[in-house]
Design a protein with these regions (language model features):
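Interfacial helix-loop-helix junctions of multi-pass membrane proteins
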Residues: 46-49, 119-129, 187-209
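Short, Lys/Arg-rich, polar N-terminal cytosolic tail immediately upstream
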Residues: 1-18
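Hydrophobic cores of alpha-helical transmembrane segments in multi-pass inner/ER membrane proteins
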Residues: 3-4, 67-84, 142-153, 211-227
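Short aromatic-rich membrane-water interface segments that cap or initiate transmembrane helices
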Residues: 56-70, 128-142, 199-214
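Alpha-helical transmembrane segments of multi-pass integral membrane proteins
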Residues: 29, 99-107, 164-189
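Membrane-interface helix-boundary motifs at transmembrane edges
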Residues: 87-98, 157-169
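Membrane-proximal helix-loop-helix units in multi-pass membrane proteins
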Residues: 111-153
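Alpha-helical transmembrane segments of multi-pass membrane proteins
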Residues: 30-51
Length: 243
């Protein structure tokens, strides 16, 4: 049973990192980025272009910046853990191995999308094609909502077979992540359409949105590691000093 995760130390021993500690460390990084985002965003709104570079580097709603990189790493980490679970489930001939594998692919795609903002490319074409605005101002949600519903149907039995505490974690993680990625995004579209993005109110809306996404991904990673710790055979990674 996988109970702890081992990493090398300079003295040749090992340090242990459990799911809770990993999630806590990731949460602290996320909280720091959220705080810096608020400071940088308010400085930009009140101080104008003098603080543009600061805001561009740390604003949560920005692109190709530090928070985006961190979010991409979280999604990629989830994808890699899912891939590891899928590999073991495949060896065990588990009936749900394809579900784990598909999830790993989905999260790697999400990580790539987060880094290059691929979904943003759909906003204007969909808005023009369907003539939507308001809560659908960010047009990609028109595609996201039915895709999420289809995945929910496909993964219903998969969720039911999971241990109850893991199922609760996964469901809550999905609610948090999708609540930010789709729910609050729709509300921000209404505000953005009328008021633009350079306001404290919009900063707060997008901060809530991205905070929910951070929380959902980190909780999901915690759930994945907890599942591995309780349900999979032991995996130990050892690193030997070179030379």
């Amino acid at each position: 049973m996988l109970q702890k995760y081992y990493v090398a130390t300079p003295v040749g021993g090992h340090a242990t990192l459990g799911p809770r500690r990993i999630a806590k460390q990731l949460g602290l990084i996320a909280a720091l980025l959220i705080l810096i985002n608020i400071v940088a965003g308010v400085a930009h709104v009140l101080g104008g272009n003098r603080y543009y570079d600061l805001a561009r580097m740390f604003i949560l709603d920005g692109e190709n910046n530090i928070p985006t990189f961190f979010s991409s790493l979280l999604l990629l980490a989830a994808g890699l853990v899912l891939a590891s679970i899928a590999a073991i489930k495949t060896q065990e001939a588990d009936r749900y191995a394809p579900h784990w594998r598909a999830l790993s692919i989905i999260f790697v795609i999400l990580a790539f999308d987060e880094m290059v903002s691929l979904h943003e490319m759909f906003n204007h074409p969909i808005r023009q094609l369907l003539g939507v605005d308001g809560v659908l101002f960010f047009g990609f949600v028109v595609l996201a909502i039915p895709l999420v519903m289809i995945l929910a149907i496909i993964y219903a039995r998969f969720l039911i077979h999971l241990p109850s505490h893991i199922r609760r974690i996964f469901v809550l993680a999905a609610v948090l992540y999708l609540g930010g990625q789709i729910g609050v995004e729709m509300l921000s579209g209404v505000y953005f359409e009328s008021n633009g993005s350079t306001t404290v109110a919009y900063l707060l809306i997008t901060t809530v949105e991205e905070s929910l996404e951070f929380s959902g991904i980190i909780l999901f990673i915690y759930g994945l590691l907890s599942y591995a710790a309780r349900n999979l055979r032991e995996i130990r990674l050892s690193f030997e000093e070179a030379g």
